[in-house]
Amino acid sequence: MISYPFFSLSPPGLVPPPMAVPPVEMYSGSFWNRMRKPLPLRTQVIRFTVVFVIVSFILAVALQITHERMPDPKVTKPLPDLGFELLTKISFLSVVTDVLIAFLSLLSFFTLWKLYLLHRHCVGSGEPELPCNIPGVSRFFLSVWLCKENCRIELRNIHTIAWIRFITSYALLLLFRSLVIVMTSMPTPVDKCQDPPKIENPVKNVILTVLTAGGGSIHCGDLMVSGHTVILTLHLMFHWIYGAMVHWSFRPVVTVVAIFSYYCIVASRSHYTDDVLVAIYLTIATFIAVGHNADGAPWQLQLFIRWLPCCGANSREVTEDSQPVMVAFKSEAVDELRERDDSAGLSGEVSTNEV
C-alpha cells in the first residue's frame, strides 16, 4: 500500500496511514498544551510590569546608542517633510505635548480605579469607604460609574485585564522602537539637538531615562516611531474601549486631546510626520492584536513570563473573588432507606453528606 502524508490528498477509499493524525490531536495533553494554560491574572500583572521595567532599560540603552550614532547636524540637514512645510514651527508646543500626556496619564489611572470599583460592584464587595467622610470627594472618587450604553464587557477582573493589555502593548512597542532607532540614524529636526550635548556618565543617563521617562536625560536622534505618539495613542485606545464604560465623555475628550497632541509634535519639530503616522498605526494594531481576554494576555506572550522564578504562582487556584458553590448529589440508596422508614412507620431522619 502507498502511504500518503496526512496533509496530502489520497485516492477515494484509501485508508489513511496511522501517522495521519491532526496536529491538534497529536499534541493533546503535551508540553504545548501545558504552555497554553493561562497564568493567574495577578501573576501576569506583576510579571508583565517587571518585563516593562526591563524593556525600559533596554530602550534607555538604545537611546544612548542612537545619540552617539546621530549624524552631525552641522553637516546633515533635516529631511524634507510635508508636515513641516504645511505647519508653522512653534517650538514651545513640545512642552504642551508633555503636559497633555501627563493629563491623559492621570485620566487613565482614574479610569483604571473606576474599573476596579466596577469589579468590586460585580463581585458584590460594595464601595470602599474613607476613614473620614468628605461628601464631594467620597462621591467623586469612591462611587461606581457605569455607562450602560458602552458596557459590553464582563466586569469581573476588568481592571486587571485592562492593565495587562495596556502594559503588554506598551512593552512590545517600546521593544520594537529600541530596535528601530538603532538600525537607522536620521538627521534630527529638534532645536535642542542641533548642538547635541556630550553624555559624560552613560550609566547615570540610562537610570535618569528610566526614572524620568526620558524627560531628565540626554538623548537625540530617536526619531522613527515617536515615543510621545505611542503613549498618546495607547491612552486613546484605552479610553476608547474602557473609558467609555466609565463615562460617555471620555471618548470625545481624549480623542480631541490626542489629535491636538499629534499636531503639537509635528509643529514643534520634535518628530518627522512619518514618525507620528507610523507610531499611530503600530500602536492601534498592537492594542487590537493583544485584545481583551478573560485569561489576560495571549498565551504566546505569557510564554515569556512563565520562566520567571518569582512574582506569583504559575498555576491557578481559588481566587479571592470566586464565589463558593455547593453541589448536592442525590443518592438512590438514601431514597430507598427513606421509603423503608416510611413503610415501617419510622420517624427518624437520614442525614446526607454535602459535597
Curated annotation (Swiss-Prot):
Domain of life of the organism encoding this protein: Eukaryota
Keywords assigned by UniProt, alphabetized: Kinase, Lipid metabolism, Membrane, Sphingolipid metabolism, Transferase, Transmembrane, Transmembrane helix
Membrane topology: Multi-pass membrane protein
Residue stretches spanning the membrane: 45-65, 90-110, 166-186, 206-226, 230-250, 276-296
Transmembrane helix recorded as keyword: yes
Enzyme's top EC category: transferase
Keyword check for Protease: no
Cysteines engaged in disulfide bonds, as pairs: none
Name of the protein in question: Phosphatidylinositol:ceramide inositolphosphotransferase
Originating organism: Trypanosoma brucei brucei
Gene that this sequence comes from: SLS1
